[in-house]
Amino acid sequence: MDIKRTILWVIFSMSLVLLYDNWQRANGHASMFFPSTTQQQAASAPAASGAAAQGDVPKANVQPATGTSAAPAAGAAPQAAAQPTGEKIVVTTDTVRAEIDTAGGIVSRLELLKEHEKDGKPVVLFERDNVRTYMARSGLIGGDLPNHTTVFTAAPGPRALDGAEQVQVVLTGEKNGVKLVKTYTFRKGSYVVDSKFDVTNAGTAPVSPTLYLELARDGSKVEQSQFYSTFTGPAIYTDADKYHKLSFEDIAKGKATVPAAANNGWVAMVQHYFASAWIPQTGKEHSFYVQQIDPNLYRVGIQQPLGELAPGATVSTDARLFAGPQEEHMLEKIAPGLELVKDYGWLTILAKPLFWLLEKLHGFLGNWGWSIIALTVLIKLVFFPLSAASYKSMGKMKDLQPRMTSIRERYKNDPQKMNQEMMALYRTEKVNPLGGCLPIVIQIPVFIALYWVLLSSVEMRGAPWLGWIHDLSVPDPFYILPIVMAVSMFVQTKLNPTPPDPVQAKVMMIMPLVFSVMFFFFPAGLVLYWVVNNILSIAQQWQINRMLGKGKAAVVAKS
């Protein structure tokens, strides 16, 4: 059996299967590998609004402390109460423009002023309207206490930095003798909102409130391309259980599991390029919960018991609300493990050092496009010894083609004898039939890892290279790079030995066309990497063939 041909056929076949699967997902059909009917339904369903979105106060211990199930507790269905109305307070800093609704003290809208959409408008992360629902909520449970349905009163004060380092919004709500004061502090240059919660028992009987912090979001994806998709949904982190993603589908089916109670960690909502997270005060015990609270509305949250408050007593606790881009180094400084919301897929072990090196190159070159090119050159240098050995093996295989063809013709009716003769030929000539495939196989994990680096890195978003490439995170608008890539792949196939099998030869000629069509929909940064990689491979192969030719000439001259 021609093992090399088999491996190439497998790689080509899998490429076609993945191509077809991406087309299926792009057209709204279930993936053959990752079916998710819940997300398809969520994408077409309107976001929850009114009482369904506003009156869904969580119940105490909605999630067991053991974390074995995430099914909603009995009685946790949305309440049909009328939605309260409140004042919309707009806070503006150099990084965000946030809207806080005094009806519940909810952060109901948040714009990222340094991140822009294609139309030039700021990216809107939090939003609550008839199309989208995504907001940060907090309140007290353990009785009829102030929660995210209570109308709060806002203290007067500045709502913009205006040269200051920070701006505060103080909200006060009272219900049944319990007063809750929320203090949101927005700081210059930060995507973190410091949140303080002061609870006072102004009644005549002891109370035992529990603070909840949650992120509520509809199940629709944003910025989903035809040919790639990243994780969208809740995530939970603790020091013991590490990073744990929870799909909307599993939550809807009651199959999602959450970590046990801890005195560390955080909860988050993740989407392509951006994330939000509630980070409670470290050292205080809290439990986690996830829940589907409407056909197209989900939440992930934390419940922190505040203990028993005697009449007149006050207890305070702090938390931080992050809402911003997935910039790895910034996330590392905010909370342990928060950088994991940047989804590198299953090759994180390779992707993280690749991004580290790419970032170092960017610090020197100042342009992400040139940094990708420089990284590609470095990767080729690392793989050069292996590639040189491989091309030498391919050169030997090319010299053996006439003898291999003769063996195939001689034993075409006896496959077993043909394989024996082939193996004998390989042993005699000291040729490894897999030698030519090795660089391809070795580079596939690196290619996939770099794919996830370029796909997941918000730094590529809006980053220009030169000329017509104004954004490395979106496809080439004029398809110039995919066409150049197709030409380079065609040249590569011409430099390789012609396969003896006519069908295989045709497949190798068609592959450049297939891959170029697929790369029409890939981010320009990724295609740039592949184009440069192909051009360097062509130059490398030409040089090695030249060296091999000189070596053969020297041998002939000596003989």
Swiss-Prot record:
One of its GO terms (biological process) is protein insertion into membrane. It is a multi-pass membrane protein. One of its GO terms (cellular component) is plasma membrane. Residues 45-55, 63-82 have a biased composition (Low complexity). Residues 45-82 are annotated as: Disordered. Pfam families: 60KD_IMP, YidC_periplas. Keywords: Cell inner membrane, Cell membrane, Chaperone, Membrane, Protein transport, Transmembrane, Transmembrane helix, Transport. InterPro entries: Membr_insert_YidC, Membr_insert_YidC_N, YidC/ALB3/OXA1/COX18, YidC/Oxa/ALB_C, YidC_ALB_C, YidC_periplasmic_sf. The keyword Translocase does not apply. It is found in: Cell inner membrane. Disulfide bonds: none annotated. NCBIfam families: PRK01318.1-3 (NF002352), yidC_nterm (TIGR03593), yidC_oxa1_cterm (TIGR03592). Belongs to the OXA1/ALB3/YidC family. Type 1 subfamily. Required for the insertion and/or proper folding and/or complex formation of integral membrane proteins into the membrane. Involved in integration of membrane proteins that insert both dependently and independently of the Sec translocase complex, as well as at least some lipoproteins. Aids folding of multispanning membrane proteins. Interacts with the Sec translocase complex via SecD. Specifically interacts with transmembrane segments of nascent integral membrane proteins during membrane integration. This is Membrane protein insertase YidC.
